[in-house]
């Protein structure tokens, strides 16, 4: 599998979706890694609009565990401790 670990914000999910589109060309699947973690210690609150857009991406791609519930915070991957995928 191809894992992607990115920021928990709209830009991070747009990058993830773009990578998925590219992977599909070769029949591959991208799996979000550590993008389903609750971000209570984030630096900035996400707007309702951004939460809606992120959730639309997650639903479209089947990444249901990554959907956000308001209020949600943006979080950069650099602020999280890395764990290796299985």
Question: At which residue positions do the language-model features occur?
Answer:
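TOPRIM fold recognition
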Residues: 2-86
């Amino acid at each position: 599998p191809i894992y992607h670990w990115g920021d928990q914000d709209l830009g991070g999910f747009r990058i993830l979706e773009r990578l998925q589109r590219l992977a599909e060309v070769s029949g591959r699947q991208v799996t979000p890694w550590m993008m389903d973690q609750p971000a209570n210690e984030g630096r900035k609150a996400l707007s309702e609009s951004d939460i809606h857009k992120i959730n639309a991406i997650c639903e479209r791609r089947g990444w249901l565990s990554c959907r956000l519930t308001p209020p949600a915070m943006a979080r950069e991957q650099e602020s999280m401790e890395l764990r290796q995928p299985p």
